[in-house]
C-alpha cells in the first residue's frame, strides 16, 4: 500500500527523550518534520531523563537528575536540570568505560562531549541538543520544532491533528498504532485529511561491545559500532505502512 498524495510531508510527534533508543531515532530520521512533544507531562517511568547503554553484564542505565520535589505534575518543557557538571562528567566517564574499544569511539565521543559541554538548564533543551548532534553526525536532515511553539489543545487526538496541521503535514507517522494502549483515535485523524503511517521497526544486528546482543539500547550503541553508516543501515530496512488513508479509513 502506498501513499499517493503528491507532495508528502511526513510528521512525527514524540516526547524529546534522552539519548533516544534506535527505534525513536529511526522514526525521527524518516520524518520531514519532527515535533518534540514538550507540552506533555514529565514522567519518571518513561525515557525522558534516562536511557540504556550496553554493559558487560547487561544493559546499564544513564540517568539525568532533574528537579521534581515540590513541582507536582509538570510539563516536559518546564523540567529543570540539577547537579551541575557532576552527572555530565559521570556520564562521559561511563560511556568511555563501556565503549573505549568501539570502532567509532573517538568520533562519537567528540560529538557527545561537545553536546554535554553546553550550559542547558532545561531537560528538553539538553535532550534536543543531543538529538540534533547525533542527527548531524549521521548526516540526517530533519526539521525539528517544539509543540509549545504552536497553539494546540483538546484531547490527545485533537492535539495530534492540530500539531500536524501547524507544520503543513499530510502524513502522520506513529510508532504506537495497533498497540493495546491507544491514546489517539486514528480514524479521527484520517477524517481530518491526514494519512496515518505505522512504523514497522526491526532492530539491525551489529557487533556490540559485549555478548550476547543487547536490544533496545540508546542509538549511541549503534553509532559507536558503525559510525555514520548507521543512517544507511536504518534507511535500508525502514518500513512505514500507510494503515489509514483519507477516503479509505479502517479500524
Which residues make up each language-model segment?
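Residues lining hydrophobic/aromatic ligand-binding pockets adjacent to catalytic sites
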Residues: 2-251
Amino acid at each position: 500500500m502506498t501513499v499517493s498524495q503528491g507532495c508528502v510531508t511526513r510528521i512525527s510527534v514524540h516526547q524529546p527523550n534522552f539519548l533516544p533508543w534506535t527505534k525513536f531515532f529511526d522514526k525521527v530520521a524518516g520524518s520531514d518534520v519532527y515535533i518534540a512533544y514538550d507540552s506533555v507531562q514529565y514522567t519518571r517511568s518513561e525515557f525522558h531523563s534516562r536511557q540504556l547503554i550496553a554493559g558487560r553484564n547487561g544493559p546499564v542505565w544513564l540517568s539525568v537528575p532533574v528537579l521534581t520535589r515540590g513541582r507536582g505534575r509538570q510539563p516536559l518543557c518546564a523540567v529543570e536540570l540539577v547537579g551541575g557538571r557532576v552527572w555530565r562528567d559521570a556520564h562521559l566517564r561511563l560511556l568511555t568505560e563501556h565503549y573505549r574499544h568501539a570502532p567509532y569511539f573517538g568520533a562519537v565521543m567528540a560529538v557527545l562531549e561537545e553536546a554535554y559541554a553546553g550550559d542547558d538548564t532545561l531537560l528538553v533543551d539538553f535532550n534536543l541538543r543531543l538529538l540534533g548532534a547525533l542527527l548531524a553526525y549521521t548526516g540526517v536532515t530533519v526539521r525539528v520544532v517544539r509543540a509549545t511553539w504552536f497553539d494546540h489543545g483538546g484531547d490527545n487526538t485533537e492535539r495530534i491533528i492540530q500539531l500536524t496541521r501547524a507544520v503543513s503535514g499530510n502524513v502522520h507517522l506513529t510508532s504506537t498504532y495497533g498497540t493495546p494502549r491507544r491514546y489517539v483515535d486514528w480514524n479521527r485523524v484520517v477524517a481530518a485529511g491526514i494519512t496515518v503511517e505505522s512504523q514497522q521497526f526491526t532492530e539491525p544486528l551489529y557487533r556490540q561491545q559485549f555478548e550476547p546482543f543487547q536490544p533496545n539500547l540508546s542509538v549511541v550503541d549503534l553509532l559507536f559500532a558503525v559510525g555514520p553508516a548507521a543512517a544507511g543501515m536504518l534507511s535500508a530496512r525502514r518500513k512505514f505502512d500507510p494503515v489509514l488513508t483519507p477516503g479509505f479509513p479502517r479500524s
